[in-house]
Amino acid sequence: MIPFVKGWTLTDPKIFIKKDAAYPESPDDIVLSLNKMMVKEAYYKDSGLTINTLCRKTNTNRSYLSRSIHRLYGTNFCDWVNVFRVNEAKKLIEKTDGNFLDLEDLAIQCGFNSVRSFSRVFKARESCTPKQYYRKRMKKKNQMKNL
């Protein structure tokens, strides 16, 4: 369906959306720059990270940032942060040289409050526990060495 304004057909309704003076950047720009900050500054490693902390860093308000993350990634703030944390855990697991890291140390290094929440989130995202993921990676490494 194409929206109408006083007899005119709008093919691009965005041209009539007024930018908010308080937020000159588009929500996508804010979240994408925040994504870069998350990777560069590793904010996700802080177990006390909140959306309010990131709002202060981006000069936005909580609901605006939350909606922007949801619009761009289709997920909530906590799940978005957990993506970074699980990816960090996978990197650390892959860097190990045969000795599996202690789960508690791994969880803390990645920004989780507990081993239980770390394992639950990891399993939900990767369909396996961190130890199962480690075993798969070791098995794959050994197969590559034998080629």
Model-derived regions: residue spans:
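Basic, amphipathic alpha-helical hairpins
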Residues: 35-49, 69, 73, 90-101, ...
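Alpha-helical bundle regulatory/interaction domains
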Residues: 1-37, 51, 58-62, 76, ...
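DNA-recognition element of transcription regulators
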Residues: 51, 65, 82
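Short amphipathic alpha-helical segments
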Residues: 84, 88, 102-105, 117
